[in-house]
Amino acid sequence: MPGKQSEDKPMEVSTVEDGGDEGLGGLTVEELQQGQEAALALEDMMALSAQTLVQTEVEELYEEVRPLGQGRFGRVLLVTHRQKGTPLALKQLPKQSTSLRGFLYEFCVGLSLGTHSAIVTAYGIGIESANSYSFLTEPVLHGDLITFIQPKVGLPQPAAQRCAAQLASALEHIHSHGLVYRDLKPENVLVCDPACQRVKLTDFGHTRPRGTLLRLTGPPIPYTAPELCAPPPLPEGLPIQPSLDAWALGVLIFCLLTGYFPWDQPLVEVDPFFEDFLIWQASGQPQDRPQPWYSLSPAADTLLWGLLDPHPRKRNPVGSIKSYLGQPWKQREGEAEELATELREDGWRGGQEAAKGEQPAC
């Protein structure tokens, strides 16, 4: 899955009036000030952490057990402390592709979030070696969520609801610290057990203080909110806000329930699946749902319509899913097939789907 490419910079509070406008998603001066306070706190933590980095080679203190993950910018290893035998996860970032500031930023964001049951706990140990920077976190041993999502099927409904509830709680916690996560996707969700009972959010390299000006420089992905695809309201970019995470959570919940992406890109002019969704959402008529939305329940429709509102200030916050937990998010057995038959017999919708091709699978 390609990541979002972006340029970002801090925003001055004076550039936006209280209340914002449609392009800003209702971001207020108070919210921007909260983001600035978070940014200042991170700067202070980074300055302190830079002075306390342990100067050593990783293998002198820790023994590698096995790889846990590999990304474009680094790798995660399961290690044990050579003296105490304590198992830990070590994220190692090569100096060739990572600046000291970039390393300190990700390290300190994790530290600033403290302890949360659905966020990987960061330990206050940063290491500078000859060729890399590293930091330590709690180990999560069962891989990431993408390996649990069966393409074109998704997760069992109870597991999907558990994951969604835990991730919404994690995002609320991040937002309460004046930050926007910005990179929600299955690859950044670690699974704690084989039954997928507990998950934890990880990787805070894209997390930024609320109000940071963001300009998208690469192609959008399914999780990219549509306001990032539009011309920015300010020359420097769009002031980011928690509604970006709400959109990504809605897309992820859809993937958990169906095993499909709802669209490739949130662009009406290039993606007919996204266009169909907007038409259906505007109609407010569940019976007109496009495929594969027909497998979802009315409660899931309402939940996802709120999280996936194209207007950011009308979009429901991530915590809105609490009202839908315990309700069915999928049609009962037989109902989805019956609705699919009705859609095929109708002909009009089925013809549209055939013309568009296959829905993108997760």
Curated annotation (Swiss-Prot):
The protein's enzyme class: transferase
Active-site residues, as the UniProt record annotates them: 183
Catalytic activity field: L-seryl-[protein] + ATP = O-phospho-L-seryl-[protein] + ADP + H(+); L-threonyl-[protein] + ATP = O-phospho-L-threonyl-[protein] + ADP + H(+)
UniProt biased composition (Basic and acidic residues): 1-11
Signal peptide: none
Superkingdom field: Eukaryota
Gene3D superfamilies: Transferase(Phosphotransferase) domain 1
Binding site for ATP: 68-76, 91
UniProt-annotated stretches for the region Disordered: 1-26, 329-362
Keywords from the UniProt entry: ATP-binding, Kinase, Nucleotide-binding, Repeat, Serine/threonine-protein kinase, Transferase
Domain Protein kinase: 62-330
SUPFAM superfamilies: Protein kinase-like (PK-like)
PROSITE patterns from the UniProt entry: PROTEIN_KINASE_ATP, PROTEIN_KINASE_DOM, PROTEIN_KINASE_ST
GO molecular function, one term: ATP binding
Enzyme nomenclature, EC number: 2.7.11.1
Family the UniProt entry places it in: Belongs to the protein kinase superfamily. Ser/Thr protein kinase family. STKL subfamily.
Name this polypeptide is given: Serine/threonine-protein kinase SBK2
